[in-house]
């Protein structure tokens, strides 16, 4: 599939990014409606099996769903699954970073248990086993079973990798969510494992049907490091206000965020600390583009890794553009998160509403790709 068939090119300069992602390519998936569908199917499952989810996830009816903006290269028939999995992570990760318990924290008890006991193949994401409420416990298990079914019946190898990343992130966050750090480098090394950059990468690789070997990861490790750093700091920059308000509400003095750390390190206010983080983000973004260019020139035959690094470029630009006005971080853009209005707004944003269902459009693109493979080299998205 040609990239132009499944995504549209955007200009970073059209968005108020404050200098972030300034020299980055930006695209948005044409099958964004499926990402919205996946998010709301996940939320409907939580309502049915656990309780009413009040937090916001990946939807952004103004700039675009996080899957559409950060993963424009994934296969159309995997967009909805990616939306479902990512929405679960959003609900789950908020429990990782707050002190919510009981009905407000859908996965809180299971996170604690997962830290103590690890995550097994039969309890792939650590959901449900610790909850004392039978309905909630069984509901979380239902969600977990559904996620594993969706992943493994689509791509078993990528599913296994994603499960491993989730498990590692769970343990890292619970053990270190309030720890102190002495240097930015020390914090970034932690944040790479904690902030979801590796999880987002795992969802992206699943969506692309791209499996990396251990050697692949070793070969690209130094190149991709500043990309992970930029992603972690971008998350901190845009989520700080939300986390700061939550910390004041709960009395939690410490939380893992680079802005909060610079406030302590430099004895400064939030605005000045955010400016330091913004400049660090821009520097890591610049470094990643330079290292990526050097890697491609030095490894002209490593086409799989070229594709991976290209996809990670969109992770950076997409996260910045999504974060600017996503309801998850920005109270002024909030609405009923369970209303399901995003696809209606999406149609209005694009100025048209196709009469074709997404499934029909996917079949048409697959047919074009099949014909292309019979007549010449296949186009790889």
From Swiss-Prot:
Source organism of the structure: Stachybotrys chlorohalonatus (strain IBT 40285)
Pfam families: Terpene_syn_C_2
Molecular function terms from GO: lyase activity
Cystine crosslinks: none
Protein family according to the UniProt entry: Belongs to the terpene synthase family.
Enzyme Commission number, as recorded: 4.2.3.-
Classification via InterPro entries: Isoprenoid_synthase_dom_sf (IPR008949)
Function (record text): Terpene cyclase; part of the core atranone cluster (CAC) which products are predicted to catalyze most or all steps of mycotoxin atranone synthesis, starting from geranylgeranyl pyrophosphate (GGPP). The initial cyclization of GGPP to dolabellane is probably performed by the terpene cyclase ATR13. The Baeyer-Villiger oxidation near the end of the atranone synthesis, which converts atranones D and E to atranones F and G is predicted to be catalyzed by the monooxygenase ATR8. Of the CAC's other predicted gene products, the reducing PKS ATR6 might synthesize a polyketide chain.
Protein name: Terpene cyclase ATR13
Alphabetic keyword roster: Lyase
Annotated pathway: Mycotoxin biosynthesis
Domain of life of the source: Eukaryota
Residue stretches in coiled coil: none
